[in-house]
């Protein structure tokens, strides 16, 4: 089941969890979507600002698998 997250802090906390497996980053002309696969849910964060999206991408944990989908 997918769940949408509105806050960046909540998203980064979910990314640091032990059951977080992978992050998919989908870039559109208007927004960027970050999708974290955890054991039970798929969490999604939608960001309109491209600079903010780059900062979030740099803030992801280094052990997490990151895949960019275009």
From Swiss-Prot:
Top-level taxon: Eukaryota
Gene Ontology terms describing biological process: cytoplasmic translation; protein-RNA complex assembly
UniProt feature coiled coil, ranges: none
Record Pfam families: Ribosomal_L38e
Keywords: Ribonucleoprotein, Ribosomal protein
GO MF assignments: structural constituent of ribosome
Metal-binding in keyword set: no
Xref: PANTHER family: 60S RIBOSOMAL PROTEIN L38, LARGE RIBOSOMAL SUBUNIT PROTEIN EL38
Family: Belongs to the eukaryotic ribosomal protein eL38 family.
Name of the protein described by the UniProt record: Large ribosomal subunit protein eL38
Source organism (scientific name): Drosophila melanogaster (Fruit fly)
Primary gene name: RpL38
């Amino acid at each position: 089941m997918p769940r949408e997250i509105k806050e960046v802090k909540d998203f980064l906390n979910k990314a640091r969890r032990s059951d977080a497996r992978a992050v998919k980053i989908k870039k559109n002309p208007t927004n960027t979507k970050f999708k974290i696969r955890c054991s039970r849910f798929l969490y999604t964060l939608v960001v309109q600002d491209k600079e903010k999206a780059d900062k979030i991408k740099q803030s992801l944990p280094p052990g997490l698998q990151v895949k960019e989908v275009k």
